[in-house]
Amino acid sequence: MMNVPSAAAASSCDDFGYNATPPPPPSLLPIMDQDGGGGSIQRDHHHHHNHQQLGYNLEPSSLALLPPSNAAAAAAHHATIAHASPHDLLQFYPTSHYLAAAGGAGGGGNPYSHFTAAAAAGSTFQSYYQQPPQAAPEYYFPTLVSSAEENMASFAATQLGLNLGYRTYFPPRGGYTYGHHPPRCQAEGCKADLSSAKRYHRRHKVCEHHSKAPVVVTAGGLHQRFCQQCSRFHLLDEFDDAKKSCRKRLADHNRRRRKSKPSDGEHSGEKRRAQANKSAATKDKAGSSSKNAGIGDGFETQLLGGAHMSKDQDQAMDLGEVVKEAVDPKGKASMQQQQQQAHHGIHQQSHQQHGFPFPSSSGSCLFPQSQGAVSSTDTSNIAQVQEPSLAFHQQHHQHSNILQLGQAMFDLDFDH
């Protein structure tokens, strides 16, 4: 009796369908169930009509891509919604209907048969969601920096700072971590670590002690010595006594230091010759300047003598005119004309002495004796330049004036 209401309720639910629909199980087609409500997206109906209009049908190929149960469900659903409008592009249907169609087609091979069996046993779909969710898969993205480079970067970070003799922006010698070994002394039995030694010792692989030792036993039991000129080990026979450099390189070094230098005597002789040449040049310059000054003084003296000569000639001609007037008063006009011509010739000659050449006039032809007098005056002018005595010049001018006066009187007598 207690089961009757429940049965009636179950029958009433079957008649009217008001009971709550259980939540849908997780779909095996996540692409089709992503959009809301748990419904699936179907475009088969519209595509079916379009394919029929175009003359070909792709439904078998599309159903072949689905599992057998899904293909059967899709065929059943296509049969149930064939009355839909051809203009509907998207068709939605609940998942429960999809499962019911699949169950009606046959439970064999249905991927959702375990859900239907659980429902028949009295359980619901909520038990599925109460299970602990699976952890999300961890995806590993490999980085671009390898482990070796990371170790190198960490090592470089520890090496930053002031380190004399090293470059601080990357570790020296690669850090000696991956197949590299620190430099060690090549002396037998030493093997000293040169990582913190000077750059010279690291480069030539010798510690400071063995680089200065007189005898070093190297590999093979050889007794050698480190040459500071060659920066390598030599046999003891190549060294002189306790020298730290081999015989050959030491001789080259001494030859460079003993290059021939100019002696002090030669240097002093060259200095003296240079001073003598300099003094001779200064003397030549002084002599040329004095010669130029002497020529200028002589030229001035010549001009002064020429001026005195012209004055004396004027005085002599005036005296000649007085004498001629006294001897021949009748021929005064002709005598004056001759005197003017003579005076013009004398002035012309005086201008020639001063450096102004003029063409010869008729006066030079009328008075050939006057040309001799002028030539005598030229010689007297040269004597004036050569003799610096002013009294001698004045006396010479007086004699020339007397000669000119006598010549003029002789000409007057010759005319008469």
From Swiss-Prot:
InterPro entries: SBP-like, SBP_dom, SBP_sf. Residues 11-53, 250-299 are annotated as: Disordered. Gene3D superfamilies: Transcription factor, SBP-box domain. A zinc finger (SBP-type) spans 182-260. A motif (Bipartite nuclear localization signal) lies at residues 243-259. PROSITE patterns: ZF_SBP. It is found in: Nucleus. GO terms for molecular function: DNA binding; zinc ion binding. Keywords: DNA-binding, Metal-binding, Nucleus, Transcription, Transcription regulation, Zinc, Zinc-finger. GO terms for cellular component: nucleus. Expressed in stems, leaf sheaths, and young panicles. Zn(2+) 1 binds at residues 185, 190, 207, 210. The keyword Oxidoreductase does not apply. Its main location: nucleus. Residues 261-273 have a biased composition (Basic and acidic residues). The keyword Glycosyltransferase does not apply. It comes from the Eukaryota. Zn(2+) 2 binds at residues 227, 230, 234, 246. Probable transcription factor that plays an important role in building the laminar joint between leaf blade and leaf sheath boundary, thereby controlling ligule and auricle development. The SBP-type zinc finger is required for the binding to DNA. This is Squamosa promoter-binding-like protein 8. The lineage of its organism: Eukaryota, Viridiplantae, Streptophyta, Embryophyta, Tracheophyta. The gene is SPL8.
